[in-house]
Structure formats: C-alpha cells, structure tokens
Curated annotation (Swiss-Prot):
Biased composition (Basic and acidic residues): 436-459
An example Gene Ontology CC term for this record: cell division site
SMART domains the UniProt entry points to: FtsA
Gene that this polypeptide is encoded by: ftsA
Major location (coarse): membrane
Chain's role: Cell division protein that is involved in the assembly of the Z ring. May serve as a membrane anchor for the Z ring.
Keywords assigned: Cell cycle, Cell division, Cell membrane, Membrane
Localization (cell): Cell membrane
Keyword presence, Membrane: yes
Record NCBIfam families: ftsA (TIGR01174)
Name the UniProt record assigns to this protein: Cell division protein FtsA
Cross-referenced PANTHER family: CELL DIVISION PROTEIN FTSA, CELL DIVISION PROTEIN FTSA-RELATED
Family to which this protein belongs: Belongs to the FtsA/MreB family.
Biased composition (Acidic residues): 425-434
Length: 468
C-alpha cells in the first residue's frame, strides 16, 4: 500500500468490509470497496478462524480489484467489546530550547501506554485532550512550537483485552497483509459527529448484527463507551418466531417490508410467508410485521438508556446518532424520536459506493488513520488539483483538529514484556473500470508523500512482546 492510500478493514458480525481511500482536501475519496458476508464472526469477534479468514481474504481481493491497488498494509477496526476508556497524563522534559515535532508527541504518548498496569489488557488508542507546553501554555497541536522545559499531555486512553487484539490481528495477517494500526470504534465514532454534537454531548448508537455499540462524546472528547449483546439478529429471530417462518425468510421480509415504528407502518402493504410446520403460506401486512420489530428495537433503545445511566450520563444535549446495518430499517428514527426529546438522526456515509449506515465504521477507521499520521508527521499529503464534488468526500476537518492518536503503532518498539456466503457491494462494471482509470490518473498526478521506514508486522511484534 503506497503511503497516500489508506485501507481499512471492518470485521462485522454479518460481513467483512474493506475500503480503499485517500485524503482529498478536507475529506476522504473512496477509490474502491469490498464486502463479503460470513458466518465466521459472532458478537463482533472471531468465531470460526478459517471461515473468517476466507471472508477477509475475499473482501481484500474485491477491494483490490475495484480500486486497482495492490493491498499489502491495512488499518483494522476493533469493536467496543472488552474495552475500557479512562484518562491519563504524561510529561517529558527538555533541557534546552527545543522545537516540538512528531517524535516528541509520540514519545509523550508512548509514556501513557507504558503506564497501563491492568493485566491482560493492552492500550490500543490514546487521544490527546490537550497538550501543555512549559507547564502553562495549553495547545491542541504543539508541533513547531518551542519548548524550554517540558511537554505534557492530558489524554483519554482506550484499552482492550489482549486475547481479542491478538486473534483479530492474527486472522487478518493470515490473509497476507500487515496490520499497520488498529482503531477502536469508540475512537472512530468521533469522526461521524459534528463539532456541535461533540461539544454539547452526543450518543452514537451503532446497531449491528449481533452487537449494539454505544459511545458518548462531550466537550469534544470521548467520555465512555460500551456494548450490548442485542441487535439485528434478535429482530430477525423475533420475526421468525412471530410469523412462524424460517430465519432466512424472516431476514428477507425484514429488509423488504420492515418498519420499526408501528404508527407509520402500512396495513395495505401485504406479503406472504411460508410456514415452518406446514406447506401453507400466510399473508401479513407491514403493520403486522412492525409489531414485532418495534418491540425489539424499543428494547434495544431502553438497553442503551440503561448503559448511559450506568455510565453516569444523564444528559444528551447533542442528540442521538444512530448508525450500523440495522439503522437501514424504516422507522428507526421515528421510534427513537418518539422515545426521547433530544434530536435524532441516522448517519450514513456520503461517498458513492458506501452510502449505507453499515459502512460508517470502516470509513471512520480511515479518518482515524489520517488524523494519526498527520499528528505525528508520518506523512505529508500533497493534495490533488482536481475538483471533487461534495458527495465524493466525507469531512474529516473536525477529526484533524482534534489531533487524536491511535496508539497501537507503539508495539513496534515494545520488547521483553512479560506477561460462506459471499456478496460484493453493489457496483456496476462501469464504476469499477472508472476506479481503475482514476487510480492510474492518481498515480500520475500524485507526488509521493514522505517515506517512512518499512514497519514489521504488528502481529509479529505483538507476539514477540508477549511471549519472548
């Protein structure tokens, strides 16, 4: 992967998604995507290694063909499972006037990772809240400033269970690619919020296949995150049981006729389903179906409210932002709006080819990767002269200004620590050919970004640090 291309992998419970993108002015230009449905993932974690590996491999291949990029290095998304979020600080001293650069920022953040003393967990992301130069000058990005005495950082930290981390990376790297870094969904969700939402206090609700993830942001920063083992699969199970039909039929009916808000569902939209205990077919209306869907989605939202209460979060002045595959259901916004007084919106990525809520996590991982690289001066992006339309990019300006950092990159210096069903994203042949043509044009017009040393495989470094 050339430095100006970013490849993200989102291993979800229903499918694996890969996006190839690049920084493009104030947004991300999506060059190619891949999606493969799989039964090898349960609750966001590896359930069957071989099945999951094949799905990941197939998805990478699809994205490579669509983008024309030979994918060798990737950024991996991690779920909010087995995750802890907390605050920490660290300070480094200077003994002469020093111009602060990316290596100094990396060093002060590295010290935070080393402070982790919770067994069986590993710090994966550190996101600076503020930097303090010479004990009194608070800044968001200290690069190029002169420090006479010290650089301090006050930061949020995301740690995850080591077993989850190791198995996810191992499965991806078994596909012949290197994991350059990992980013928690708790961290990634910041890029789908507006500056106002993050400042006032916003709750992201990502309703996936097996897991619903919750993250709360306030005053511009991640406050806490958690997950609920209730999501889209439970909705389908309820439909199958309520309509006395198979799970597969219930899934199709959910996507074709599903509505999460009973009051808005139609009693004129009629469909038939086969019964599991007879050869008969029975007719139902969308309103009949909505009765089952609304009850389960409502229960999911009540579980979210319980999570917020358990975290001590009682005000959501910035509103609720719902995303994930199950956010595709009609009526989700109306139902939640009926349950709360705060603003509610459904988040869908803006780029062509990924305009579905289930791609929010994958594109957000690229946003995190760009913010991380620019904070540490790993790359210097030379922008295209070409003009882009608003629909082709997603704004990452807020993410850049936050100066967040993903911390798993620090593993490369860590040593001696003791301790099959597939389906491609819909795209026409014309879009694929156009992507390949665009790739050739990018290669001609792009100036290469600054080179950095070839990194050894994250998984190999991690295994060395854990078992040597």
């Amino acid at each position: 992967m050339e430095e100006h291309y970013y490849v993200s992998i989102d291993i979800g419970s229903s499918s694996v998604k890969t996006i190839v993108g690049e920084k493009f002015h104030n947004g991300i230009n999506v060059i190619g995507t891949g999606q493969t449905y799989t039964s090898g993932i349960k609750n966001g974690l590896i359930d069957d290694f071989d099945i999951a590996r094949q799905a990941i491999k197939d998805t990478i291949k699809k994205a490579s063909i669509a983008s024309g990029v030979d994918i060798k290095e990737v950024f991996l998304k991690l779920p909010i499972i087995g995750t802890e979020v907390y605050d920490e600080s660290n300070e480094i001293d200077f003994y002469e006037d020093t111009e602060i650069n990316g290596s100094h920022i990396e060093k002060v953040l590295e010290g935070i990772r080393e402070k982790n003393d919770v067994q069986e967990t590993e710090v994966i992301n550190v996101f600076p809240i503020r930097f303090i130069v010479d004990k009194e000058n608070e800044v968001s990005d200290p690069k190029e400033l002169i420090a006479r005495h010290s650089l301090k950082v006050e930061a949020g930290v995301i740690a995850i269970q080591k077993s989850i981390l190791i198995n996810m990376i191992k499965c991806v790297e078994a596909c012949g690619v290197d994991v350059l870094d990992v980013y928690s969904d708790a961290y990634n969700y910041g890029s789908i919020l507006t500056a106002t939402e993050k400042e006032l206090g916003a709750c992201v609700i990502d309703i996936g296949e097996d897991v619903t993830q919750v993250a709360f942001y306030e005053r511009g920063e991640l406050v806490d995150a958690d997950s609920i083992e209730m999501a889209g699969r439970d909705i389908t199970d309820d439909i199958a049981q309520g309509l006395n039909t198979s799970y597969e039929t219930a899934e199709k009916v959910k996507h074709q006729y599903g509505h999460a808000f009973y009051d808005s569902a139609s009693d004129q939209d009629i469909f038939t389903v086969e019964q599991v205990d007879s050869d008969e077919t029975v007719q139902y209306t969308q309103k009949d179906l909505s009765d089952f869907i609304e009850a389960r989605v409502e229960e999911i939202f009540f579980e979210v409210f319980d999570v917020l209460q358990d975290l001590g979060l009682t005000k959501v002045n910035g509103g609720f932002i719902v995303t994930g595959g199950s956010a595709n259901l009609l009526g989700v916004k109306e139902l939640l709006s009926d349950m709360v007084s705060e603003k509610v919106r459904i988040h869908t990525p803006s780029q062509m080819g990924i305009r579905k809520p289930e791609f929010s996590s994958a594109i957000s991982t690229i946003s995190s990767s760009i913010a991380f690289d620019e904070l540490l001066d790993y790359v210097t992006i030379n922008y295209h002269d070409n003009e882009e339309t608003e629909e082709d990019v997603i704004d990452v300006k807020d993410k850049d200004n936050e100066s967040k950092l993903g911390g798993f990159d620090w593993f490369k210096r860590k040593t001696n620590k003791k301790d099959t069903h597939e389906n491609e994203v819909e795209s026409s042949d014309e879009e694929i050919y156009q992507s390949e043509d665009n790739h050739q044009e990018h290669k001609q017009n792009h100036e290469h970004v600054q080179d950095k040393d070839k990194e050894e495989s994250k998984f190999k470094k991690l295994m060395k640090s854990l078992f040597e």
